[in-house]
């Protein structure tokens, strides 16, 4: 059902170049994962990015509800560890910084006004404040370093493929923001 729905409602309307493969939850149940495990090529992944960049619209046809797309990259869990993750997208795209108190955070923000703060969280263990910055983008990450990045503020998408996970996506996104 999920694979058929995805094929009919998304894959075919977007004119994807190749069939995707979808991971199953287990050999026993064989239920398609809808939360991850989608394997496709770079062009088809870019089409998904374009779909989200255009708020669910593909060449004048609304494929995904605009309200759902907006919710997909809006913060959900203020103050929790999942504060930058929503509907399979990450939106704290620039950097994390830690501050001992709120005043230090305010001073940093005054010094760097272009660094938009997406959310702040206070650590229960250390009492530090973590500020997660945002520059208009959101991204999805694959298991081995595949990344689909969408920046609605600057109107571009980027697809990264890799064989290994890398932990410096935020640095790459920050540099792209400055270049584009």
Predicted features along the sequence, with ranges:
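Hydrophobic core segments within long, regular secondary-structure runs in both alpha-
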Residues: 3, 7-11, 66-70, 173-177
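Generic secondary-structure transition motif, activating predominantly at the C-termini of alpha-helices
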Residues: 14, 73-77, 177-180
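A small/polar active-site loop signature that marks catalytic segments
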Residues: 1-25, 35
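Solvent-exposed, acidic/flexible segments
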Residues: 3, 38-42, 169
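Penicillin-binding protein/beta-lactamase superfamily catalytic region
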Residues: 19-152
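Structural helix-adjacent loops and short alpha-helical linkers that scaffold large soluble proteins
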Residues: 1-7, 56-64, 165
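Structured C-terminal helix/loop/strand segments within mature extracytoplasmic catalytic/sensor domains
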Residues: 109, 137-180
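Alpha-helical scaffold elements that line and support the substrate/ligand-binding pocket
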Residues: 1-10, 44-52, 155-158
């Amino acid at each position: 059902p999920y694979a058929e729905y995805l094929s009919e409602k998304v894959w075919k309307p977007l004119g994807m170049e190749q069939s995707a493969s979808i991971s199953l939850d287990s050999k026993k149940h064989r239920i398609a994962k809808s939360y991850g495990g989608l394997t496709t090529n770079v062009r088809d992944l870019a089409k998904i990015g374009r779909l989200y960049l255009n708020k669910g619209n593909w060449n004048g046809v609304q494929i995904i509800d605009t309200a759902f797309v907006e919710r997909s990259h809006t913060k959900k869990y203020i103050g929790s560890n999942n504060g930058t993750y929503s509907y399979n997208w990450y939106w704290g795209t620039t950097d994390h910084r830690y501050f001992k108190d709120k005043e230090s955070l305010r001073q940093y923000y005054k010094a760097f006004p272009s660094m938009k703060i997406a959310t702040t969280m206070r650590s229960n263990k250390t009492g530090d404040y973590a500020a997660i910055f945002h520059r208009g983008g959101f991204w999805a990450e694959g298991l081995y370093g595949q990344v689909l990045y969408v920046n609605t503020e600057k109107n571009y998408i980027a697809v990264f493929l890799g064989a290994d996970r890398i932990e410096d996506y935020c640095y790459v996104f920050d540099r792209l923001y400055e270049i584009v």
